[in-house]
Amino acid sequence: MEFEIALAKEQSYLDIIPKKASEEIGRVLAELTISPEELRQGTLLNGVPILPLLELVKEKLSTESKTYLHFGATSQDAMDTAMVLMLREALGVINERLTTLEDNLSQLREKYGDTPCMARTRGQLAVPISFGDKIDAWLEPLKRHEKRLTTISKGALKIQLGGAAGNRAAYHEKGETLSDALASALKLSSGSSWHAQRDSLCELTNWLAIISSILGKMGADILVLAQSEINEVTENAEGGGKSSAMPHKNNPILSEALVALAKLNAGLQSQMLLCLIHTNERDATAWILEWSCVPQMLINTATSLGHAIAISKKVKVNTDNMRLNVERFKNQG
């Protein structure tokens, strides 16, 4: 609806549609009450929710204004732009959590970074390192990818306005100008339409998968360090992760979730790569894959960051055991 309001307004500024029609379209859309059931039935019939939504709007428009609703645009223009607007909002949450986690890990490093502990390579004791070295393996990749998000977001958070076949033919020589104006109104990047060019979106979801995998590595490390016979880290110093059969346990449940969510996002990203095989000028089979993958990957990444933040706040670093394990290793020689 935000897309349709902005589209009509910018079209009127460029004299593509009458100002009176634009104002009526904007007013009706702003006041529209949507029936989820009507939208559901229309989506089942047509494959996308845009047609039933437009029908609901047209019922309240004058005969003249109906002609100018959604003028020159296609359902994918509205759907993709709506997805991008929601992506922007979700990425705001994710970036905020990422910054919080980096701050927490930096504080953890400042407090425990000089503590000696054992490196473990290929599942075996290697040589002594510091706990700061281990934290760096979690923190530094997060910092690198926070910087990369700015560039990746610019490519992915882009207006979609291609019309029937992606070339904006309905707008004649005003197509590019309209796209730029619409992008500016919605505070998105502009450029050519990307109906069948999904690489920027796939690059963004790959970023989500990488963030999840970095956190999965953090979770996997903690799962080893929290093992009873090692006991260098307790995931939650306040308790939790209880067992119904073994009350003595304090299971590292959030670290387990980090590993599981990393694997889920890795699998979903493999499906996103298939969306690049977007046949000809539009391909709903690829589109439907995105509808399933993108929201879930956002949820998985935000959840992973939330779990990692909780760990960084509540983790207990058992420095005595770290030093003890180092001394045991030295005494083996």
What role is predicted for each listed range?
Residues 1-168, 174-181, 241-243, 253-257:
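A helix-coil-helix interface module used to build multimeric assemblies
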Residues 78, 118, 122, 126-133, ...:
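Alpha-helix capping and helix-loop boundary segments enriched in small/acidic/polar residues
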Residues 177-266:
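Acidic, glycine-rich loop-and-beta core segments that form the ion-binding/anion-interacting portion
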Residues 1-3, 13, 23, 41-46, ...:
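Glycine-rich cofactor/substrate-binding loops
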Residues 88-95, 99, 106, 136-139, ...:
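Short amphipathic alpha-helical segments with heptad-repeat character
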Residues 75, 167, 172, 185, ...:
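A structural signal for small-residue-enriched, beta-sheet-centric alpha/beta enzyme cores
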Residues 6, 10, 56, 60, ...:
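Generic, well-ordered alpha-helical scaffold segments in large soluble proteins
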Residues 111-114, 148-151, 155, 184, ...:
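Conserved helix-loop functional segments at active or binding sites
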